[in-house]
């Protein structure tokens, strides 16, 4: 007598799931490839691949500062611009020559890279620093530390309190 083992049969069937998680059209990673292609002046696949290589930017938050790190291989320090727009946005831009020989051949062109970040409200825009070493740009945006509000101590007067005026236990009794 043959036995029916439904679990073994079902394991052999590999179907794609019917329902997939919906894709939100405004998520950044869906548009990142398109923006990389639009920012390059030459639509060749080599330029698009190079623009994609240059687009890794990360952000980290610490207690003292916001740290931005951009991987920009093959970019000279003179080709990088870090700007603050309207005291609200940090902009990292590069414009690269692809090494064209100037005779109109198809090998030359310009490539650009730009990322814009909205800065938090409490940052010191004048204290922003940037450093470029080994193909990695690091931008440090320090937090704006305001001094603590002064605390006023109230002195207990001798006029009928029976204890210190600021003591919550004395007031409750």
From Swiss-Prot:
Domain of life: Eukaryota
Alphabetized Pfam families for the sequence: HSP20 (PF00011)
Keyword Cytoplasm among UniProt keywords: yes
Induction text: Not induced by heat shock.
Keywords: Cytoplasm, Stress response
Record's signal peptide: none
Cellular component annotations (GO), alphabetically ordered: cytoplasm
Keyword Ribosomal protein: no
Record-linked CDD domains: ACD_sHsps-like
Summary of subunit composition and partner proteins: May form oligomeric structures.
Record-given protein name: 18.8 kDa class V heat shock protein
Organism of provenance: Oryza sativa subsp. japonica
């Amino acid at each position: 007598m043959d036995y029916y083992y439904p679990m073994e049969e079902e394991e052999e069937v590999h179907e794609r799931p019917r329902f997939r998680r919906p894709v939100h059209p405004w998520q950044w990673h869906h548009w990142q490839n398109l923006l990389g292609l639009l920012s390059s002046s030459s639509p060749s696949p080599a330029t698009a691949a190079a623009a994609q290589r240059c687009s890794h930017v990360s952000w980290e938050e610490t207690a003292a500062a916001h740290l931005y790190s951009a991987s920009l291989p093959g970019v000279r320090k003179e080709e990088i611009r870090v700007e603050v727009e309207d005291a609200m946005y940090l902009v990292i831009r590069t414009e690269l020559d692809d090494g064209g020989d100037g005779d109109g051949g198809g090998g030359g062109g310009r490539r650009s890279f730009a990322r814009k970040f909205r800065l938090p409200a409490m940052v010191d825009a004048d204290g922003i620093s940037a450093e470029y070493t080994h193909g990695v740009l690091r931008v440090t945006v320090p937090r704006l530390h305001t001094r603590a509000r002064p605390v006023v101590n109230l002195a207990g007067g001798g006029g009928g309190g029976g204890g210190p005026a600021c003591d919550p236990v004395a007031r409750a009794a």
